[in-house]
């Protein structure tokens, strides 16, 4: 998946997170075809990293506690799978913070 598509999916699906000034920044990976998106707010800081072979890593830390609230690795083969995982897993956990 291209980084711009991933960035749009994240912004579209994270809009309901009660975060002030949600910022998403693209970071080019050192390994070919890898990249990450850093996602920062007042409530959490995090990243979604894409590795070759459709492998994603999701890592979010609470700003209030400094503890990991999400640290998951997942193979997602389509945009639909990514959207569902963001809504049903990542977004749900962030809203529970």
Residue ranges and their predicted role:
Residues 1-41, 63-80:
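Negatively charged, low-complexity tracts enriched in Asp/Glu with abundant Ser/Thr
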Residues 35, 55-56:
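Hydrophobic residues embedded in beta-strands of well-ordered beta-sheets
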Residues 49-53:
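Short beta-strand micro-motifs enriched in acidic
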Residues 57-63:
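Short, surface-exposed beta-strand/strand-loop-strand elements in extracellular ectodomains
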Residues 75-97:
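Amphipathic alpha-helical binding modules
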């Amino acid at each position: 998946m291209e980084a711009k598509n991933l960035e749009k999916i994240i912004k579209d699906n994270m809009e309901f997170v009660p975060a002030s000034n949600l910022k998403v920044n693209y970071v080019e990976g050192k390994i070919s075809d890898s990249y990450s998106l850093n996602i920062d707010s007042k409530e959490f800081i995090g990243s979604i990293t894409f590795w070759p072979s459709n492998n994603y890593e999701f890592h979010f830390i609470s700003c209030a506690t400094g503890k990991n609230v999400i640290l998951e690795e997942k193979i997602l083969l389509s945009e639909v799978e990514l959207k569902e995982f963001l809504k049903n897993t990542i977004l749900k956990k962030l809203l529970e913070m």
